[in-house]
Structure formats: structure tokens, C-alpha cells
Amino acid sequence: MTRAFNKIKLHGFNNLTKTLSFNVYDICYAQTFQQRREYIEYIDEEYNAERLTHILTEVAEIIGANILNVARQNYEPQGASVTMLIAEDETEIHQQFTNAEEPGPLPESLVCHLDKSHLTVHTYPESHPENGISTFRADIDVSTCGRVSPLRALNYLIHSLESDIVTMDYRVRGFTRNVYGGKHFIDHAINSIQNFIAEDTKGRYHMIDVNIYQENIFHTKMMLKDFELDDYLFGGNACDLASQEQQAIADRVKNEMLEIFYGKNIPHPDIESSRR
């Protein structure tokens, strides 16, 4: 059961640092060298620095932050990154915020008290040289020094970056004092990151939690339940392939998803023979 938190009267500034690390993976099968190159080019365009800046700007709006500075870069031959420095919103006194353990907006305006916090995103496209599998990873970090948790932006991020696999880590560090001098090492209720995710999203994903409550560390990973081969073929259609080839490709893609989800190599007879 989630422990309820009463409003804490603080002595001075809220010194808690709350960090959300959000990693998404997109997987596809591109059979030829040309298709693999086109996939990388597509991902590079779809997730260029301009679009990533827009996503982080929306995140800043959701958590009620002012953007102080933006640094962004597209890389050769591939990849992009954006870093934002954010600070507290001056309109804070006119708006309300909440740390309720519930899904965040898509998006809607919230306000928090921030000081020298930051948002970052980096992308990592790659492809296997032989077996046709190509993957794309985006890492987003939202770190706030203040009252509103970056988990308020989680729902927006999931819907903005529709992905095959999502890995999330949330931690709270430091402490803040109440007016009597007592320390508070967390200032909001949480027993799972899943409670901040919309029900329709949870219904579409397999989800696993690994939490260390006494250390204020929360980990959730998600993998899509439904599998349609056409969704994973780049530059081709399943109907153009023989049934045996469809099955072989599906096995490769599913194996790739499982390995990423569980974070380890999983033996598969056909795939192992191609690795040797």
C-alpha cells in the first residue's frame, strides 16, 4: 500500500534532487545493406536535434520550468543530442502542482520549484552487419531540484516516443528539512513508476519492476505485447515473403527484443549459428 504524504512545511529551499532516466528502443528488420542505410537515415531525420528540442521543451512545460539555455547537435554519421538548463517558474505562486501517484498529462501545464536543473537527450542508431536487425535507442534524463517530480513528464514521453521497449529509472537523492530541523529524504508517495503510467499504455506492454524502496530507487521496464511482423519490416511487406522466411525474421526480431528487455544474450539455434 502506498504511504500517504502530508504537506511538509520546509525550512528554506527544497534540496531534494529527483532524476528520471528514460531509455527507449525501436527495432526493425532491414534485409539489405541499402535498406539498413535508409533506416539509419530515416531515424536520423525522424529524431534530429530539432524534434528532440521540441520534445524537451514540452517536458519543461509539463514540469513548469523556465528554459535558460539550449545546446543541441546533430552528429555525423548519425545521432543527435540536446541539453537544456532549466530553472524555477516565476509564475509558481499563481498555479498549483501535484505529486500524486498517478499518470501525468499529455501534456498540461504544471509548476515546480527548480534550481539549476537539466534535461538531456541522446540518440544511438545502429545496425547488425549480417542478420538484418537494426535498432534505435534514445536516452532522456530529466533531473529536477525542487518539489515536482520529473515523473509528471513520463506519460508524455511514452506517448511521444512510441517504442518497442522502454526502460525507466527514478531516484531521489539528498534531503530537505522541515521547520523543526528534521530531515525528509523523499517528499512524495511512490511504490512503483507504473502508477504514473496511463492504463491504456500499461495494457499494451509487459512490465517488470525492480525497486529498492529503502534507497529511493525505482526501476520499471516495458515491452510491447502485440507483435505484427509488418510493423518491424523496413522497406518490405510480410506478404511478399515465404512463410518460412516470415517465421525466421519474426524469430530474429523477437529474440532481439527479449535480449534488450532482459539485458542479456539469449541463445537461439538459428541466430547462434549466424553469430559464430
Curated annotation (Swiss-Prot):
Record text on cofactor binding: Binds 1 pyruvoyl group covalently per subunit.
CC per GO annotation: cytosol
Main EC class the enzyme belongs to: lyase
Modified residues (Pyruvic acid (Ser)): 117
Coiled-coil boundaries: none
Assembly and interaction partners: Heterooctamer of four alpha and four beta chains arranged as a tetramer of alpha/beta heterodimers.
Keyword annotations of the record: Autocatalytic cleavage, Decarboxylase, Lyase, Polyamine biosynthesis, Pyruvate, S-adenosyl-L-methionine, Schiff base, Spermidine biosynthesis, Zymogen
Family, as annotated: Belongs to the prokaryotic AdoMetDC family. Type 2 subfamily.
Protein name, UniProt field: S-adenosylmethionine decarboxylase proenzyme
Active site per the UniProt annotation: 117 (schiff-base intermediate with substrate), 122 (proton acceptor), 145 (proton donor)
GO MF, one example: adenosylmethionine decarboxylase activity
Pfam families listed in its UniProt record: AdoMet_dc (PF02675)
InterPro entries: AdoMetDC_fam_prok, S-AdoMet_deCO2ase_bac, S-AdoMet_deCO2ase_core
E.C. code: 4.1.1.50
PANTHER family in the cross-refs: S-ADENOSYLMETHIONINE DECARBOXYLASE PROENZYME
Role summary: Catalyzes the decarboxylation of S-adenosylmethionine to S-adenosylmethioninamine (dcAdoMet), the propylamine donor required for the synthesis of the polyamines spermine and spermidine from the diamine putrescine.
